[in-house]
Amino acid sequence: YARMITGREYFGRRQGKVRACFDFQDFDWTGENWKKIPARDMILYQCHVRGFTKHKSSNVKNPGTFSGMEEKLSYLKDLGVNTLLLMPAYDFNECMHDENGVDLKKVNYWGYTEDAFYFAPKAGYAAKKGEQAKEFQKLIKAVHSQGMNVVMDFYFKDVSPEFMLTCMRYYALRFHIDGFRFNQECVSVEWLRQDPVLSHLKLFGYHWDECGYEAGQEMFCEMNDRFLVTARRFLKSDEGQVEDF
């Protein structure tokens, strides 16, 4: 699988051919201070890597990047947050297609698309071209040094359960990710429970009880984000939100 992508360095721009490239970089995790936070104590902050610091008010050196987010970790810690839930931070194609070809004005900002290279950190989130893996690792190390955890959100589409498990293991081992949110109905709970890597992480999903979940298992975390979604819509003045509130 492609672990680094070239040709998508500039977010929202079509830049010609997309190619896989070699990645021989090592990373020094010395001094990481990695601690696992119990699920019951997690205070999650869901964020988009680019959107979190892209506005000039963020006052970071490299807005809209992994490095930019690293600069704001102390701000998040002051809020009381101890776990980051990152919306897709792997490489996805944000340039959307329509029936007549490519509409350059349409951008899939959030990254929930099947047109993705799941094993490659997003090139468009790197401050320096070709450094996306290193900058992502640096971000994770800084998060852990703050006593916080990181959960990645994956939108797997039309891939096998084996692919999903392999992908999550890769990020857990190479990037020290603490957990994942994913469409868990595609994977056997027993596989997850017996996995030598994933069984030690936090796995977020909806309706684990329908997948064979048994109460009291620390690794399985139930997503309950209805208030989050309704509150956001209410603040945007969307119609019909008072009743939902």
Language-model regions, residue ranges each:
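Hydrophobic faces of well-ordered beta-strands that scaffold small-molecule active sites
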Residues: I43-Y45, L84-L86, V150-M152, F180, ...
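A conserved hydrophobic secondary-structure block that centers on an alpha-helix together
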Residues: R50-L84
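Carboxylate/His-rich catalytic cores and anion/metal-binding grooves
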Residues: L76-V107
